[in-house]
């Protein structure tokens, strides 16, 4: 599946589930009332059972319609969406969940486009009149159209779907649904499948039969639990160590996303969850299992809470059978894996890349065209598809580390990707969702991960945030302490001429590049010849590679008396020179510095400000124009 198609499918599924998930509390309330008070319930009560019909016929579809309209057209969209949904409800003889998913967004879309059309055209004093009557008239028209057209069409469509489902049930084909459901879950379509497809079908079946198997096709925690148990006994390295905690969160907490990375780590395990899912559905079909309402989240506790009287054995058997088959298949696949230590190698490789990125001042597993300066970060959001389970746990882990580090000015929360606010500074998402997040808030920095409970990544990020905040604080302290002798005008101090710029250079070693920069400082009258050796001596103490293709060689403290006046030479090495300790610590911009007293602090600060943009660095590394270099360093970009 291509990236664009996957994002579109995720977005559409996300939209469907966004209409249902905010109203899950209402579904659960209806499910509990049904389980308790209907004639076959735990506490049969003819009076209280009268709540069941109106809630499923009117309340739940209206809530979905209102939410769908609000998603598209705001508050006014929600009102018109609810009015339109009422037309669908009255126009059909069955609960209109699918109809409300069409009518609600349609109402929101119509009022949204009407508001755009009249924007700026309403005379002063008539705004409230137009707003109220437009919503009423458009809602009336859409309700009539929904009553006459959408309702009957959706009713016919629902009957066709029901016939198809009944065909699958009668011919014992329902387990085949797991072939599509389980892989789709791994692509983070689990909420879309459960709340966008199975919940509407399940509610209708539950209303007729008192329970529905559809609520357990996707929500069954058995297949994922089997995979995690297999990792606990037969996994290796960090995957084995973390599987126990993940199993508790998955099985009791109902956060299914927690096991996705374990399957992605070894894609062959998709076969295990498919076979486990098929076994679970088959067992539920044979034994007559099902729930009265959606189990959200998909925890064994939620499953038991939504189980009607007489279905406990069937539901528990369905979960256990799915878990057992998934465990056996996963164990076989893990034990016979041709690539030994596969999960360890991938984890170690990612950790190595994270640590290397950290050492060079880059975000671990950062994605997109973003800056790596974290000094401005004040708002961090851990985002997932639904903005609930997995991201909430990740945000909790990171929040504790941030608080323990004393970074009280930084807030850490969780959110659904579609609800990311424009003022977020840093977004953390699963790697399969990062592209969607970048489209939602392109101005923010983005970090990808493969496991929302990756403590190592959060520790690395916290350390970088601490370092960035400390650097900013130290810079302010330096400026305050030197303000009397400090000239904040970079034009007075940091002023390059064409004679200080050397383009298209080549060097085999960093010593050769440093020696050339030193010789140019001597020729420019900035330093005495002995300063060149002091620059080489300084490099032996600690590499002067800053990261981002920049090195700033300069002399030792003892050589300051060899500086005649503050000066800078800019040397470009398009092919690069290795300056750092790592093989890819390649400098393309070598900036030799000589400064008297504390003036080097001002010089470095000025350079940092000028080279704060990655695109500027890229242009400086390849330009053949001295004038362009002068303009870029002067900030005239």
From Swiss-Prot:
Domain PTS EIIA type-2 span(s) in chain numbering: 494-636
Protein's recorded name: PTS system mannitol-specific EIICBA component
CDD domains: PTS_IIA_fru, PTS_IIB_mannitol
UniProt keyword annotations, A-Z: Cell inner membrane, Cell membrane, Kinase, Membrane, Phosphoprotein, Phosphotransferase system, Sugar transport, Transferase, Transmembrane, Transmembrane helix, Transport
Domain PTS EIIB type-2: start-end pairs: 378-473
Intervals, Cytoplasmic compartment: 1-23, 71-133, 186-272, 335-637
Domain PTS EIIC type-2: 12-341
Membrane side Periplasmic: residue ranges: 46-49, 156-164, 293-312
Site (Stabilizes the transition state in the phosphoryl transfer from HPr to EIIA): 538
Catalytic residues identified in the record: 384, 554
Induction (UniProt): Induced by mannitol. Repressed by MltR.
Organism: Escherichia coli (strain K12)
One Pfam family here: PTS_IIB
GO biological process: mannitol transmembrane transport; phosphoenolpyruvate-dependent sugar phosphotransferase system; sorbitol transmembrane transport
Subunit annotation: Homodimer.
InterPro entries: PTrfase/Anion_transptr, PTS_EIIA_type-2_dom, PTS_EIIB-like_sf, PTS_EIIB_2, PTS_EIIB_2/3, PTS_EIIB_mannitol, PTS_EIIC, PTS_EIIC_2
């Amino acid at each position: 599946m291509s990236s664009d198609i996957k994002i579109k499918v995720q977005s559409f599924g996300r939209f469907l589930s966004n209409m249902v998930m905010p109203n899950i509390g209402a579904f659960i309330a209806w499910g509990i009332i049904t389980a308790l008070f209907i004639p076959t319930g735990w506490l049969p009560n003819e009076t209280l059972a009268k709540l069941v019909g109106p809630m499923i016929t009117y309340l739940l579809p209206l809530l979905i319609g209102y939410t769908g309209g609000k998603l598209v057209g705001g508050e006014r969209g929600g009102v018109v969406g609810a009015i339109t949904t009422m037309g669908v409800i009255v126009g059909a003889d069955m609960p209109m969940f699918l109809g409300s998913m069409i009518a609600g967004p349609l109402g929101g879309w119509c009022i949204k486009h009407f508001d755009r059309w009249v924007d700026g055209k309403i005379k002063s004093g008539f705004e409230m009149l137009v707003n109220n009557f437009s919503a009423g008239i458009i809602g009336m028209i859409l309700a009539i159209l929904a009553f006459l057209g959408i309702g009957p069409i959706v009713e016919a469509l629902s009957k066709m779907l029901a016939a198809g489902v009944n065909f699958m049930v009668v011919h014992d084909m329902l387990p085949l649904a797991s072939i599509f459901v389980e892989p789709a879950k791994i692509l983070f379509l689990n909420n879309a499948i459960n709340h966008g497809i199975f919940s509407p079908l399940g509610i209708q079946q539950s209303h007729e039969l008192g329970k529905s198997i559809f609520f357990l096709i996707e929500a069954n925690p058995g297949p994922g639990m089997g995979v995690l148990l297999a990792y606990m006994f037969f996994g290796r390295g960090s995957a084995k160590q973390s599987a126990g905690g993940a199993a508790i969160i998955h099985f009791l907490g109902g956060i299914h996303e927690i096991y996705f990375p374990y399957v992605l780590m070894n894609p062959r395990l998709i076969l295990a969850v498919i076979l486990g899912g098929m076994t679970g559905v088959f067992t539920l079909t044979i034994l007559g299992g099902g729930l009265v309402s959606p189990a959200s989240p998909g925890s064994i506790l939620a499953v038991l809470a939504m189980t009607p009287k007489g279905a406990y054995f069937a539901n528990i058997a369905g979960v256990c059978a799915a878990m057992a088959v998934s465990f056996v298949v996963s164990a076989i696949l893990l034990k016979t894996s041709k690539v030994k230590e596969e999960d360890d190698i991938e984890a170690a490789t990612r950790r190595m890349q994270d640590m290397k990125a950290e050492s060079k001042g880059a975000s671990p597993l950062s994605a997109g065209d973003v800056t790596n300066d974290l000094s401005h970060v004040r708002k961090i959001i851990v985002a997932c598809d639904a903005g609930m389970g997995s991201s909430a746990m990740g945000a909790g882990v990171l929040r504790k580390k941030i608080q323990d580090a004393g970074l009280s000015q930084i807030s850490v929360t969780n959110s659904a990707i579609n609800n990311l606010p424009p003022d977020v500074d840093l977004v953390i998402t699963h790697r399969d969702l990062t592209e969607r997040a970048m489209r939602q808030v392109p101005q923010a920095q983005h970090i990808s991960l493969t496991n929302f409970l990756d403590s190592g990544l959060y520790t690395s990020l916290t350390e970088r945030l601490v370092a960035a905040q400390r650097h900013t604080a130290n810079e302010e302290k330096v400026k305050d302490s030197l303000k009397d002798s400090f000239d904040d005008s970079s034009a007075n101090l940091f002023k390059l001429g064409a004679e200080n710029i050397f383009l298209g250079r080549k060097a085999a070693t960093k010593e050769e590049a440093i020696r050339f920069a030193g010789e140019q400082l001597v020729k420019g009258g900035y330093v005495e010849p002995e300063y060149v050796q002091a620059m080489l001596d300084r490099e032996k103490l600690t590499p002067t590679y800053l990261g981002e293709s920049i090195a700033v060689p300069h002399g030792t403290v003892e050589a300051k008396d060899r500086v005649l006046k503050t000066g800078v030479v800019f040397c470009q090495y398009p092919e690069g020179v290795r300056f750092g300790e790592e093989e890819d610590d390649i400098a393309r911009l070598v900036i030799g510095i000589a400064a008297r007293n504390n003036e080097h602090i001002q010089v470095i600060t000025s350079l940092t400000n000028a080279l704060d943009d990655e695109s500027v660095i890229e242009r400086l590394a390849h330009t053949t124009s001295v004038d362009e270099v002068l303009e870029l360093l002067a900030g005239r970009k």
